[in-house]
Amino acid sequence: MKTDGNTTLDTTISMEELERTVKSAYEALAKDQQDDGHWIYELEADVTIPAQFILLEHTLDKIDEELEQKIANYLRRCQSREHWGWPVYYGGEFNISASVQAYFALKMTGEDINAPHMVRAREAILAHGGPEYANVFTRIQLSLFGEASWLATPFMPVEIMLLPRWMYFSIWNMSYWSRTTVAPLLIVADLKPKAINPRNVHIPELFPTPPDKVKTWIHGPFRSKWGHVFKFIDTAIRPFTRFVPSFLHKKAYKAALDFIEPRLNGVDGLGAIYPPMSYSAVMYRALGIPDDDPRAATNWEALKGLLVIKEREAYCQACVSPVWDTALSGHALMEASFGPDGINADRTEKLIDRAAHWLRAHQVLNVVGDWAINNPNLQPGGWAFQYGNDYYPDVDDTAVAAMLLHRQNLPENEEALDRARKWIIGMQSSNGGWGAFDIDNDKQILNDIPFADHGALLDPPTADVSARCISLLAELGHPEDRPVIERGIKYLRKEQEEDGSWFGRWGTNYIYGAWSVLCAFNASGVPHDDPSVLKCVNFLKSVQREDGGWGESCETYEGSAHGVYTESLPSQTAWAVLGLMASGRRTDPAVKRGIVWLIQHQQDNGEWAEEPFNAVGFPRMFYLHYLGYKQFFPLLALARYRHMEKSGTNNVSFAF
């Protein structure tokens, strides 16, 4: 049921109805726990990843006909009926890179290019300039298939692997996702292999200008004058590569493989994300490594582990999110069982015991990851996002998982909490904030090189991640950590937007950032009448929709108004309500309207519906849809409101 936005919304909340909603949501979430105690939900990205998987199968001639037809069904469904291209998030504008890759993949699967949807897609691609305006990763695909020469890709010599940490363009100054992607890609770009392409499929019809006539493939965006400088250097330096001594070239190859192979990470794959795994598959084939070699075979298994295969459709995820899903699900269930009137206390204890056991087993305690380049004496103690990614734990997952273990309040969690606390403190950047995976990963000039047209080569501190770290440290309550917390709060104050919100680097967007920071401020003792808090509260109230909910589009990463969308969404409504309650506004009509919206939009099965994307990988380029968000965040918000209403308090007692 949707409320008429032109009418005054009734904010009367029936406690009986609230009780029923919370219990139904609890059951829906509890049933999804896996046998070993963890939760895992689908993590959908845009069409580029499934399209690239089809292209990878044809690059290597490892074609699964049934699978690729299911992926083709998915690609057809995701095609826009407005602009007939493919967006990079639900309901988004035409995107040239996604559209070129999806069209190419569909043609690979045998799609008739004269079918109406293919004709319209082709017309849209041509109207936007064709593949020469696509991003770097699309142009790499084109080069592999011979649709364009390797001159269409940025110059990335494998000798980059030899650069020491103190040199700006060292891989150690890149983000983890860039570092793991670049290492195999450097070898691929050097060897310039050609896809097997057994069906001999090509896409000349997409090029308004023949590829060999294109004068420049580097179109920006140029974020500073350095972008133009690096474009010139890219062209000027290429002829000199033949003068690189062969011994140095071989040494660079060895350095690349010495980096990659210890991090192959078994069936979880290099970096536990799709791009490094896919380039590793191409790299091993180009190096002449047989497919049955354990390195190549296991890497292929890791890639297949990202597939979501259903009856009619299939798609490939960019990665999986079990640690994140488990910690967030645990928080929601514990909130529902909190207090003397909590529901299912005994059952929840058993569910959380199993989740905590699983989390403790997945804490990274013995592997010194890449993060140590900036703090070599720091002892490991974090969690990764995926099942296994020991070289790359992140502070966000670590904070949320540790807060769950702390809330459980059992002796067996003490060592895990101590290791997590010390690791997070050691990961604080010099400006007081936290990046997700690295310390001081903020050499912005790197985002000006031609390879970084996505603008996400780095992992600088962000407000949302920093807020979670502050929340954990405040919750743990060690007096000696107060200077660390204060530096973090100072960083957050500097990062506040003019309208009172905070940027959401990993969740969409300013509503997510606002919720994250308000929770951290509350946990760390920032008064509810602090000017920063009041300004953020006013922001959240100003963007509440007439139906009582909140919604925000991924367009906000591209410059549109903060906190605005065409519909209210369960996850974002929950974030806004949680943020307002953390600022002492439990009795505010805005909170009540949000709670009413969540109650009214719950489905009969205890779940909520949410199709739009709710998170981001790389702003302006790559967005995500966490299918678990629509479940655990509404339950967390409703359960918290229920407890606060029953106890008559306006103070949130927990940090998350």
Swiss-Prot record:
InterPro entries per the UniProt record, alphabetical: Hopene-cyclase, SQ_cyclase_C, SQ_cyclase_N, Squalene_cyclase, Terpenoid_cyclase/PrenylTrfase
Ranges of the PFTB repeats in the UniProt entry: 68-110, 417-459, 485-525, 533-582, 591-634
Reactions accelerated catalytically: squalene = hop-22(29)-ene; squalene + H2O = hopan-22-ol
UniProt keyword Repeat present: yes
GO molecular function: lyase activity; squalene-hopene cyclase activity
Enzyme Commission number(s): 4.2.1.129, 5.4.99.17
BP terms from Gene Ontology: triterpenoid biosynthetic process
GO cellular component: lipid droplet
Domain of life where this protein originates: Eukaryota
The keyword Protein transport appears for this protein: no
Site, as annotated: Transition state stabilizer: W324, W506
Keywords: Isomerase, Lyase, Repeat
Statement on biotechnological application from the UniProt entry: The fast anaerobic growth of Schizosaccharomyces japonicus in sterol-free media is an interesting trait for developing robust fungal cell factories for application in anaerobic industrial processes.
Active-site residues, record numbering mapped to chain: D396 (proton donor)
SUPFAM superfamilies found in the cross-reference section: Terpenoid cyclases/Protein prenyltransferases
Function: Squalene cyclase that catalyzes the oxygen-independent cyclization of squalene into hopanoids, a class of cyclic triterpenoids including hop-22(29)-ene, hop-17(21)-ene, hop-21(22)-ene, and hopan-22-ol.
Family: Belongs to the terpene cyclase/mutase family.
PANTHER family in UniProt: LANOSTEROL SYNTHASE, TERPENE CYCLASE/MUTASE FAMILY MEMBER
Protein name: Squalene-hopene cyclase
Record organism: Schizosaccharomyces japonicus (strain yFS275 / FY16936)
Classification lineage: Eukaryota, Fungi, Dikarya, Ascomycota, Taphrinomycotina
Gene this protein is translated from: shc1
